[in-house]
């Protein structure tokens, strides 16, 4: 089978907290070992078991803001008093080498990432089947206190209001189905004509 070289896909998955974006993104990474993960920069403290450079790049707020000011971050935001951002260099290097990447970020990150990489981003928004189900899922998280859940529910409504900015939308009422749908989005993105290098030369050779 002929495989032409192509530019990588930047798959962005966004959703309100509890809708399943991280679970879906992790399932894609587990099923496709070649799928690259962007290691974000954050100003929050490491949680037990988290490793620098594997889960996050942990930086203080001054360094984080310097990176943002110097253009070293493709996108960044301060959420709940914590800074999160995507380093520019490793992403651009991976895409140019033909490696696909998946990001689980919020709508603001998606907007900034699309502005920075307009030809590379393919985006997917994950909706919960209902707000009641979303609240139930958040309540199952033992680490979140009632005040935190209330704050996340308020933030969820804001996140959901931006669903129409995304290329694709799925409803996560069944996780296996949602993962399969996300994989279909990635497969279609890989086949985009604009992403396949040397395709023009290959087709031109048919008439020789």
Swiss-Prot record:
Residues bound to ATP: 15-22
InterPro entries per the UniProt record, alphabetical: GK/Ca_channel_bsu, Guanylate_kin-like_dom, Guanylate_kinase, Guanylate_kinase_CS, P-loop_NTPase
EC number of the protein: 2.7.4.8
Domain of life: Bacteria
Boundaries of every Guanylate kinase-like domain copy: 8-187
This protein's UniProt keywords: ATP-binding, Cytoplasm, Kinase, Nucleotide-binding, Transferase
Pfam annotation, one family: Guanylate_kin
GO molecular function: ATP binding; guanylate kinase activity
Main localisation: cytoplasm
Function of the protein: Essential for recycling GMP and indirectly, cGMP.
Family named by the database record: Belongs to the guanylate kinase family.
Identification of the protein by name: Guanylate kinase
């Amino acid at each position: 089978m002929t495989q032409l070289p192509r530019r990588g896909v930047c798959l962005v998955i966004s959703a309100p907290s509890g809708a399943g974006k991280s679970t879906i993104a992790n399932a894609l990474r587990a099923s496709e070992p070649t799928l690259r993960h962007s290691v974000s920069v954050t100003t929050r403290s490491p949680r037990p078991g988290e490793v620098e450079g594997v889960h996050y790049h942990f930086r203080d707020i001054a360094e984080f803001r310097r990176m943002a000011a110097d253009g070293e971050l493709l996108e960044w935001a301060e959420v709940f008093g914590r800074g999160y951002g995507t380093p520019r260099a490793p992403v651009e290097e991976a895409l140019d080498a033909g490696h696909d990447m998946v990001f689980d970020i919020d709508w603001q990150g998606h907007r900034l990432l699309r502005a920075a990489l307009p030809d590379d981003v393919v985006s997917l928004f994950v909706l919960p089947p209902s707000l009641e189900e979303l609240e139930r899922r958040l309540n199952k998280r033992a680490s979140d206190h009632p005040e935190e859940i209330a704050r996340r529910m308020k933030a969820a409504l804001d996140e959901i209001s931006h669903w129409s900015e995304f290329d694709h939308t799925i409803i996560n009422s069944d996780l296996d189905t949602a993962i399969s749908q996300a994989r279909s989005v990635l497969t279609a993105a890989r086949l985009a004509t604009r992403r396949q290098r040397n395709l023009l030369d290959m087709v031109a050779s048919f008439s020789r």
